[in-house]
Regions:
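Polytopic transmembrane helical bundles with strong interfacial aromatic enrichment
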Residues: 2-512
Length: 512
């Protein structure tokens, strides 16, 4: 029952469950962005084949399709495990919001996944069996299916961070969807999708350029390598610029609905107007928010007024810090944001009202519940400081993402310059650097997810359900055991994928 949300569950069980889900998500995200990125490269290459009818482009397409196929299979396998964990480890969450959260996942499984499965078969086995136009359409539709799949999953994730389009039913103890469009087309969902997909294109583009540079180092497949660098670097440069634009909008959206996350990203303990954006700083790893004493990162280099501009679109806009959010603050429009302690009191009122209504069916409890429902999750918070996520992790992960992203813009621009204006094969240092960019691109992408997920702690659903109340009633030992089983399984899968990819890359394209 949601009014008695597993208050006896040990913190170790919660930590192991979080670790297991994080492990699965991190491994899953090693495969997904490469799938989305390679889909674009395959589509461009086959479009060139369709328009020119040159066998060369067919060989290019089929080569990248082989690598796509291996990665696609691994992504599906880890994704299935990830969805099952909602039911096994997070059953309270599944019960509480399953009517809302389950809808986009169901659409993803029924529509997008079946779309992918249908057209991927034509893409791999339809060469010379269907018309060139239909095969080209199948290739693009495979990529579109994967992208639509990502859309619905990201809609579900965005709803957890910015819950809209739902209403709580005290009789069923569940949230019920009131507006599908509000859920599917929320500004948070749209921005999360565009930023995530463009970052995936960056991963695919980096992979293509790096593999092509390896061929140039080995003095093999010169024509394929140069053509692929042109495609990959072109896609990558466009994607990095788009990712920068959508990233800027992400910061703005986070500032509106998750101010604590933004404060953690900036290690901003005490906010104000005209806040600067920290470029470089040293954050104390164990520093805790202090109500009395201002705490600033050491060796701080900042851009004046930039944080206020990103968060409010005005150079002198007010940005709350960690302590401001804990103690309560006044918005620019004059409305007051309650302190965390006030929200905790109101959350407890909502829980008591719900419990009383469930036991007595007293109708006078429903207005109390409705009035305080927006703070329902705070009723399970024992200490206001639980609302502060890990500031060092958020701070450094954000800068790692932005720093590598900026480096990738230069990398793709230089790739295009060298392949079009110079003899790129002569620049051995660049060819080696390109290979190193693969892990860096992945680190940037994973760092973005770390900021998004660590930054919203302790919430499973922002303001409505903390992690401690979302968990299943399972034993710590069971979760710990499956954690190590999954660790071994996923590591094996990753090792197998890398070995197959390396083998296929060394083998090279197959010429008819």
């Amino acid at each position: 029952m949601m009014t008695n949300l597993l208050l006896d569950i040990t913190s170790a069980t919660i930590d192991w469950s979080r670790a297991q889900f994080a492990l699965t998500a991190i491994y899953h995200w090693l495969f997904v962005p490469l799938t989305l990125g390679l889909a674009v490269i395959m589509g461009i290459a086959e479009t060139c084949y369709y328009r020119t009818n040159k066998p060369f482009w067919k060989h290019v397409t089929r080569f990248w399709q082989k690598l796509f196929g291996v990665n696609f299979a691994m992504g599906v396998a880890t994704g299935i495990i990830l969805e099952f964990e909602f039911g096994t480890n997070w059953s309270n969450y599944s019960w509480f919001v399953g009517d809302v959260f389950g809808a986009p996942l169901a659409i993803e499984g029924i529509l997008a996944f079946f779309m992918e499965s249908t057209f991927v078969a034509v893409m791999f086995f339809g060469w010379d069996k269907v018309s060139r136009g239909f095969h080209l359409a199948s290739t693009w539709l495979t990529g579109l299916g994967a992208t639509i799949s990502a859309w619905w999953i990201l809609v579900a994730n965005a709803w957890m961070q910015y819950p809209v389009g739902q209403e709580f039913n005290p009789d069923t103890m569940r949230f019920e969807m009131t507006s599908f469009l509000d859920v599917a087309l929320s500004p948070f969902a749209i921005n999360k999708f565009t930023h995530t997909v463009t970052s995936s294109w960056i991963i695919g583009a980096t992979f293509v350029v790096a593999v092509s540079c390896w061929y140039l180092l080995k003095k093999r497949e010169i024509q394929l390598a140069k053509a692929s660098i042109k495609m990959g670097a072109g896609v990558g440069l466009i994607a990095t610029l788009l990712a920068a634009m959508t990233g800027d909008n992400s910061a703005y959206r986070v500032a509106q609905v998750q101010p604590m996350k933004l404060a953690a990203m900036e290690a901003l303990y005490n906010g104000g107007k005209g806040e600067s954006l920290t470029a470089i700083a040293a954050v104390h790893p164990f520093q805790q928010p202090d109500y009395e004493n201002e705490q600033e990162p050491a060796m701080r280099i900042a851009i004046p007024n930039m944080l206020s501009f990103l968060a409010t679109r005005t150079a002198d806009g007010y940005v709350p810090g960690v302590n401001d959010i804990l103690k309560g603050y006044t918005h620019e429009d004059g409305t007051r944001e309650p302190s965390v302690q006030e929200k905790i009191v109101r959350g407890k009122k909502a829980i008591v009202a719900l419990k009383t209504y469930r036991e007595t069916k007293a109708q006078d409890q429903l207005p109390i519940l409705k009035e305080n429902m927006k703070y329902f999750g705070y009723g399970y918070i024992k200490d206001a400081r639980e609302l502060v996520p890990s500031i060092p992790i958020c701070f450094y992960a954000f800068r790692l993402m932005v720093g590598v992203g900026s480096l990738l813009i230069l990398f793709f621009a230089l790739s295009l310059f060298l392949v079009y204006k110079k003899e790129i094969a002569q620049y051995r240092w660049f060819l080696i650097s390109a290979i190193i960019m693969i892990p860096l691109a992945y680190i940037a992408s994973e760092s973005g997810w770390i900021v998004a997920e660590i930054g919203r702690q302790p919430w499973t659903i922002q303001d409505l359900l903390p992690v401690s109340a979302a968990i299943s009633d399972i034993e710590e030992g069971s979760v710990a055991t499956t954690f190590f089983i999954f660790l071994a399984l996923f590591t094996t899968m990753l090792t197998v994928e890398i070995s197959i990819l390396v083998k296929q890359i060394k083998k090279g394209p197959e010429y008819e």
